[in-house]
Amino acid sequence: MSDLKITKGTLNLPSAAVRLIGDHPLQITASSNRHLLLEVTGQKGDLQMAGRLGDIAIVDLLSFFNMFRKSGALHCALSGGDKTLFFQNGEIVFATSTFAEEEIGETLYGLGMLDREVLQGARQFASGVMTLGKALIDQGVVTSKDLWAATRSQVETIVFNLFAFQEGSFAFFDTRLEEDQVLSLSMNTQNLIMEGLRRVDERAVYMQKVKSLDAIPVATGKVPNDLDSTSQRMLALVQRGVADARELLRRSGAGEFDTLRLLSQLIERGVVAMEEAPTVKVEGVLGE
């Protein structure tokens, strides 16, 4: 980020900041001879804390809010998108994300609850008039129970994926959620932290075997007698043929992390091999 200077009492902000703030009035929340913290006035929830990720790790932030039983919203501005985690008495109860792959429709698709054409149709049907979830329920594509389970999976994925970021900025506001927005997650915040850290480490190990989500899983013909039922279903999907590992992750319905783990185990045992995706020759002259 380029340096900012106050010239004749005027501070010129970067265009990106101006687009975010708009014409809302600002107030100085904190200042010293080394920093100046400005806050938009008249918004819901007061700013309690702000800083840069990297100087403060995600795990330390989440542990702090959990230890001191904080309630509010932690907004993280990251490379490629934003995430907001909502706390109630120190526990994460909801989360939102602007990352496309963490949208509820993509979560439902990733869990194998609908296909791409149905998802696109539901998005057009919703078209700003209603939420995508309500549109899918109204169309009979999913049940309320399906949507609740997918939303819980979505929130946990948003949290788990947050641990992969080492840079960005954060701000914590004392914004409260409405009661009907509060989710009961499958694990408390401390367990989410431990699981998130574990997944970052283990996913890197699994990907060493899988190599790429664009690679094609192929059955080798070897079928051990001691495969559990989940591994057998995974192998059956591979035997029927999938375009690539990414499609296998979606069709398994087990979620990305667990599917990568199972696929990695099948590769390690020689049951599945990964082949490079074939290259496609494009005819013609570039630019035509």
Task: Pin down the residues of each PLM region.
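Acidic, Ser/Thr/Pro-enriched low-complexity segments and adjacent helix/loop capping patches
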Residues: 1-288
